[in-house]
């Protein structure tokens, strides 16, 4: 029984690590966040002093990036 719990939690940890890597790689390929750093917000990057959601597109005439100032 304990073996099953350990295997389950190990699998969960591996899935979590894979998701973090996937999110960070999306940050680097996103035009809005080319020079950004990975951050813990899902599908987001640091962009200047703001957090940019991955789906935002700064190339639009009116910038639609939703920014949150970092404290």
Swiss-Prot record:
Main location: secreted
GO terms under biological process: defense response to fungus; killing of cells of another organism
Alphabetic keyword roster: Antimicrobial, Disulfide bond, Fungicide, Plant defense, Secreted, Signal
Keyword match Endoplasmic reticulum: no
Keyword Secreted set for record: yes
Compartment annotation: Secreted
Transmembrane segments annotated in the record for this chain: none
Disulfide bonds: 27-45, 33-50, 39-52
Signal peptide extent: 1-25
A Gene Ontology cellular-component term: extracellular region
Family: Belongs to the DEFL family.
Name of the protein this chain belongs to: Putative defensin-like protein 303
Native source organism of the sequence: Arabidopsis thaliana
